[in-house]
Regions:
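Sec/Tat signal peptide C-region and signal peptidase I cleavage site
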Residues: 36-39
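An extracytoplasmic/periplasmic, membrane-proximal ligand-sensing/linker region
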Residues: 47-49, 190-192, 279-343
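A ligand-binding cleft/hinge motif common to bilobed small-molecule-binding domains
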Residues: 113-123, 187-191, 218-252
Length: 343
């Protein structure tokens, strides 16, 4: 034995003190003990049917997306997965139900970007940042800027120039104030300093019809609402929101590519659970959603609604929630948007 080895062991007794042995044994068992609750939660998950709550009416696009996801999840986990449509109170009834549900990961909320915006428009019974745990992002929703093809406008720059001269009307239309297309249009006219009052229309179909009829020059809408007009040559696509081109129209540049620096907004669709849901259960659910996005039926249903399938984990969705809440609530305060509650 070398001298240094001898010196290292000189003060260590051959037989450890019993108390020291017990302390070492307890410390060794601590990681296992801490892991047991999480493992126990996962062993029986899901222990009863899943409930996917949706802030939309039965038969709507969002309801169809939820049902496609629920069907696939049911096949994966071997448990019933129900869709619960709660469109009341502009969809806030859905959030209220999930916020009050047990934090056992069996009740989930399917929502999109406007979920974190709504409390700035009208009183909400929950806080989207504090009362929910993001699970996973499952899709994004790009919007296209489309113009009446009869107009001599082929670029976004030309549209903005004519809007400044008030020779064309760029809408801020929607059937409900605070919809995604409405918010993006408000951001557009604010960034490029021209006047565009809000026009009440019936959904995106009504919005597009205004452009086709020549009552508006342009609008923001998802691709399925525009596809017929584009294929018939009545509408011209100038650009798309988001950080990358859309697979719906890959030759259409992003608005950022056209020179609108920073205009890369894209809505997300994500799943949420009540606050205080244990992290292992969030991760397990996120994994199942990721598997579900490999389903051709889920992909087809998402794309039929204008959504691009895109999975991101809980942390990435949480970051998007905080970013969008800060940005869009700030815009709402700046332009003083309010939902008419009839009071």
């Amino acid at each position: 034995m070398r001298a240094c080895d001898s010196n290292l062991r000189a003060d260590v007794p051959d037989t450890p003190d019993p108390r020291r042995r017990r302390a070492i044994a307890w410390l060794g068992a601590l990681p296992v003990a801490l892991a047991l609750p999480a493992r126990a939660e996962l062993l029986g998950y899901p222990s009863h049917p899943l409930r996917l709550v949706v802030p939309a009416a039965e038969g709507s696009v969002f309801d169809a997306v939820a049902r496609a996801l629920a069907t696939q999840l049911q096949q994966q986990i071997g448990r019933l997965a129900d869709v619960d449509d709660r469109p009341a109170a502009n969809g806030m009834a859905a959030g209220d139900l999930v916020a009050r549900a047990p934090a056992d990961s069996h009740t989930l909320l399917l929502q999109q970007t406007t979920f974190v915006v709504q409390p700035a428009l009208e009183p909400a019974p929950y806080d989207p940042l504090r009362d929910f745990q993001p699970v996973a992002m499952v899709a994004t929703l790009p919007l296209f800027l489309a113009v009446d093809a009869r107009l001599p406008i082929t670029t976004v720059t030309e549209l903005i120039a004519q809007a400044h001269g008030e020779s064309v009307s760029v809408n801020c239309g929607s059937d409900i104030i605070g919809t995604w297309s409405h918010l993006v249009a408000e951001q557009f006219v604010r960034d490029y300093a021209f006047h565009a009052p809000h026009v009440a229309v019936r959904g995106e179909a009504g919005l597009v019809q205004q452009v086709l009829a020549g009552r508006m020059a342009a609008c923001f809408a998802c691709y399925p609402s525009l596809s017929t007009g584009v294929s018939s040559g009545q509408l011209r696509l100038l650009g798309v929101t988001g950080s990358a081109r859309s697979s719906f129209a890959p030759t259409t540049p992003t608005l950022r590519e056209t020179g609108l620096a920073g205009f890369d907004y894209s809505a997300w669709v994500g799943a949420f659970m009540p606050a205080r849901t244990p992290k292992p259960l969030l991760i397990r659910a996120a994994t199942e959603f990721r598997r579900a996005l490999a389903s051709s039926d889920v992909i087809a249903t998402l794309r039929a609604g204008g959504f691009e399938p895109e999975w991101s984990a809980s942390d990435a969705l949480a970051q998007a929630v905080r970013r969008d809440a800060n940005h869009w609530q700030g815009l709402i305060r700046q332009v003083d948007l309010r939902v008419d509650t009839g009071e």
